[in-house]
């Protein structure tokens, strides 16, 4: 295998440029409290979730009342994401290439791993049921209604008021920055938006832009869909009628809103489904915790939709553990470093082969959606 270094030979390259990078910062915004020690591929972290406790009245008596059992649950973070981004250069390449080629290629390698981890983390949106906004319509055209609706969902699910984040794609952020509430200093409260173009902390959340925001390919079923049969507590399959078109589809990760107003219940679609004669049996990710009568309205955002997010830090957990720097490197140079943009812990291994050197950055990580109720999609 040979390299093509036409564009890094000194006579053709006046100045090297570092890699252009996305704002792949999701890992900085989620819970990172589970990274104390180095780990190996396949190891896991148990995250305990406390069980609810009901207060009871105290009545003096000779005997004590019965003890109340508690049943905490757990969510497992498996460290199974092991990725590398290598590049190699021969001795001839190193002699001929401009002095800046090494940091340029290293920057590209780190960028590749950062984007991979960012996409991995953002991919957990598939199990986030709450949503605001309209599918296919970029939010914040004239108001912050999409944000306040998302904030309402987090407030109703008891999300802590601190450590709330908003992640927007470039189009949504551009719309938001046009609003006087964010761009004009007399309404914003400071000059941050005017000077550096960042929204910062506003309306009880920290706002960030991320070019890696995913686009979800939603199913085609729309119209005024309804429950065609009563929804009961613990039910995992919803019977949905009045689908348009009559053979409309529901894709994995689609959201469903059953009912209206303060009693509405949100679900995500677990298994793809297709309607037959306008009726579909749709398996949802979390069993129903309330009832709804047949005929209850169902809202199904359909088609292509950007998945901007509002979430509390503890909705997601992420752990990246440094792969050990071997004391028996067998001639290889192995060291660990932290990417200043994303905060990811990477390992660099430099290995000598026949007349060439291979540079390989790798990462071992894992993540999990710990509390889906603490996140909300802002559709675009």
Each model region followed by its residue ranges:
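Residue-level recognition of conserved beta-strand edge/terminus positions
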Residues: 48, 258-259, 301, 362
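Internal mixed-charge
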Residues: 201, 205-214, 268-375
